[in-house]
Amino acid sequence: MFELILSGFAAVFADPMSIAMVFLGVMVGIIFGALPGLTVVAGLSMFLPVTYVMASNVGLSMLTAIYIGGTSGGLISAILLNIPGTPASIATTFEGAPMAKKGLAGKALGLGVFASLIGTLVGVIVMTLLSPTLAILTLKFGPWEYFSVTFFALTLISALTGKSIVKGLLSALFGMMFATIGLSPIDSAKRYTFGSLQLTSGFHLLVVLVGLYAISEVFSTASAKQQPVKVLSYKMKGLGFTLHDLKGNWGNLLRSSLVGLGIGILPGIGGSTSNIIAYSVAKNSSKHPEKFGTGIPDGIIASESSNNASIGGAMIPLLTLGIPGDGATAILLGGFMLHGMVPGPLLFQQNGDLVYNIFGSMMLGTIFMAVLMWAGMRMFVQILKVPTHILVPLIVVLCSIGAYALGNRVFDMWGLLLFGVIGLMMSR
């Protein structure tokens, strides 16, 4: 196994295109994570069509890099705007914003990046070591086990529906109905085409994903009342912190990373929950819980290490069982399918080289994330000031180009609009 892991890492570091796309993916992810309203899921959805023309290893490496960068990028707006860039950074605002108001924004940002680095490393390392072992176990699955896994995946709808299970089940029903449009895979019989030649091909998976996640987010952002962005000033020298700032927090760092990893493995939860739980655990374990909420490093370290560790955790059920751990891995599932692969028990057997290549690219993406965040913090902070009326049209145009490029059909662009409206209605 270790030989395969090393070969996968070597393949990534020896491929300039993979390195370039991982670098670009991390940068894109940080930008989407930092901008409130444009989540990592929207970023993945938007760039999923871009990977269509890439080699499988390069395209999937770019998507995982966006995942890593987007999860970490949320800390920037959480600290400087007191607005979490992603749901996974909610707990970061509890301590980050008070520290920024004290004039310690640079230290808060530096500690957040360091915690993100350690958390992601823990998650990726455990994923790399644990996934192949679980894959060997899942290869022994028979019909009963496959049925159980499929049934379990369907029951996850109840965990992902928020307060209304009925709405979630109806959404699943509509999803399955849309999936039946087109030609039957068994006898090529036309289903629900209503005489339309365009509907014969059905709705492309990418059109559905980009519409539901990216276009709907754009509509939501555009329809919301925009307030002038006030970014708190900050000074950040070097890494932004010293080893003395980590005194007494090494245990918190490791514990929170493990909390995020464990919660990430549980499908349907992910970083949006792990950061809150890790923050609560850190507060209850602290000798001075009354200081939490006043602006101390402990809360930032707990939140950012846990939400980034959940990345590796969420990837484990995706790769070994084909069950996405959160919304971002659901998009990655679409990425695998786009490139002709189905995550699950046979993935390691049929595409083992690619999987280990992804492991290597995620490790490289983790390093790029830390370097870019520390070195390019000033640039990312300036991006927070970009007006919404510039961002929204740009994103719509890029998404439309990606949808049209799939099959050179204007119909796919109309499908993008349709599912964007559906996604907006579902979010309301």
Task: Give each language-model segment a name.
Residues 67-78, 296-321, 325, 343-372:
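A structural-propensity feature for long, helix-poor, extended segments
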Residues 46, 80-107, 133, 234, ...:
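Flexible loop linkers connecting adjacent transmembrane helices
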Residues 110-223, 338-428:
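Membrane-embedded alpha-helical modules
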